[in-house]
Curated annotation (Swiss-Prot):
CDD domains: Pep_deformylase. The keyword Ribosomal protein does not apply. Fe cation binds at C88, H130, H134. The active site is at E131. Its cofactor is Fe(2+). It catalyses: N-terminal N-formyl-L-methionyl-[peptide] + H2O = N-terminal L-methionyl-[peptide] + formate. Its EC number is 3.5.1.88. This is Peptide deformylase. One of its GO terms (molecular function) is metal ion binding. It comes from Desulfitobacterium hafniense (strain DSM 10664 / DCB-2). Removes the formyl group from the N-terminal Met of newly synthesized proteins. Requires at least a dipeptide for an efficient rate of reaction. N-terminal L-methionine is a prerequisite for activity but the enzyme has broad specificity at other positions. Binds 1 Fe(2+) ion. It comes from the Bacteria.
Length: 150
């Protein structure tokens, strides 16, 4: 296992649309393992592959309910609206108020290639949307109503 360096704002990979995973190989499994190690090392709740310099549609999340590993995630339903503060491991020292859906439903593959459906609200909903935005080259500061230094 390895801890990746987290890419910060200004890096091109954060602004690119990430490439879908066509086949779940041992390298994808290793990427998931190392991304989780990196997430925990950084005391984060979510991490997308572009944040570690890899343009793949891969996300790991742990909001305190155990790790979620998402390959090629897609938001299939949204409900309500919630305005709250967000931060990002790739934009240290900055927070911003971002409007997100209050609840989401996401489809993604797990590391075994099985389709899973994740329903989230609260922090999980916000984290799912934030990380999937990373896969589209979108950062929270692009959507923030206002930002401030921590």
């Amino acid at each position: 296992m390895a801890i990746y360096q987290i890419v910060e704002i200004g890096s091109e990979v954060l602004r690119e649309k990430a490439v879908p995973v066509k086949e779940i190989t041992p390298n994808i499994a290793k990427l998931l393992d190392n991304m989780l190690d990196t997430l925990y090392d950084a005391n984060g709740v979510g991490l997308a592959a572009p944040q570690v310099g890899v343009s793949k549609r891969v996300v790991v999340i742990d909001v305190g309910e155990g790790p979620l590993e998402l390959i090629n995630p897609v938001i299939i339903a949204k409900e309500g609206e919630d305005l709250d503060d967000e931060g990002c491991l790739s934009i240290p020292g900055i927070t911003g108020q971002v409007a997100r859906a209050a609840k989401v439903k996401v489809e993604a593959l797990n590391r075994q290639g099985e389709l899973q459906v994740i329903e989230g609200e609260g922090l999980l909903s916000r984290c799912l949307q934030h990380e999937i935005d990373h896969l589209e080259g979108i950062l929270f500061v692009d959507k923030a109503k206002k930002t401030s230094r921590r």
